[in-house]
């Protein structure tokens, strides 16, 4: 039997708009007395919600059933949508309601917007977000970094100032224990380092490995930052929690940077300090084949006769690990010392 339209005078009212968000629209409709649910379900009125395709201007069914409410989800923010209600009687007659138009709301400001503003170095957007008061300034991103950490790491000094003026905690640490000061020191952003220090950042903070900001600055190799840090009073011979390495030891292990090593030694770093295995900065420089740093350490008082806790010295280490250039340097140094002793006699 062919379905018949309900008389136009019996057209249903358009769906009523309920709660609207940036991604959803709630629609509901009232049952008239004649459409009360009595008897088996096949004797009930059935409802369909149809949504208009804005390009084709055709309607597609997004819900059909016996409920009197439906929430349309997965919508775009600030977008106009058009819906109509289709009511089908138990006998198969049907009618469409007038169309209802409704727009989704603006996407609410979230922590993602905060971090996006910092990532693109957008001062105006950052200020608007913070002044809106809907986002906590210290909420971390998916990597565990606060907005201040990201700004400090990238050297966005003006953003750092904005964030601090809005109450960010300069001493918060990420998942590995690094704070904004460590990140700025490693990246070499001296202006940021100075500003963080003026606003309470501490040289005494340790990451999960026990490293200080100076350890990270030594890895970064930015001499202007290291020089200022030393002048500002950070501890030159702080040891980490794992290998008990000082910043000078990290230079020997990581970069071999002579300028950084010289700055640290000039500031009083112990050239003969030992780590948990009894290794000195000289031994570590030999093992990592940092020839020029080996020369510098020897010139600055490193003791080549020291043995580690396994009884091994720098010459033996150079031979075992085939550090030929370093070995030649050490042997020549030893010969000169022998000749000097002989001439004294």
Curated annotation (Swiss-Prot):
Record-linked SUPFAM superfamilies: Ankyrin repeat (SSF48403), Fibronectin type III (SSF49265)
Pfam families assigned to the protein according to its UniProt record, in alphabetical order: Ank_2
Ranges where the Fibronectin type-III domain occurs: 11-108
Superkingdom of the organism of origin: Eukaryota
One record GO biological process: positive regulation of DNA-binding transcription factor activity
Keyword entries, A-Z: ANK repeat, Cell projection, Cytoplasm, Cytoskeleton, Nucleus, Repeat, Ubl conjugation
ANK repeats by residue range: 109-139, 143-172, 176-205, 209-238, 243-273, 277-306
Keyword Ubl conjugation: yes
Post-translational modification summary for this protein: Polyubiquitinated. Polyubiquitination leads to proteasomal degradation.
GO annotations of cellular component type: ciliary basal body; cilium; cytosol; nucleus
Complex formation: Interacts with COPS5; regulates the phosphorylation of JUN and the transcriptional activity of AP-1. Interacts with RYBP; may prevent the ubiquitin-mediated proteasomal degradation of FANK1.
Task performed by this protein: Through the activation of JUN and AP-1-mediated transcription, may regulate apoptosis.
Domain notes: The fibronectin type-III domain mediates interaction with COPS5 and RYBP.
Protein name: Fibronectin type 3 and ankyrin repeat domains protein 1
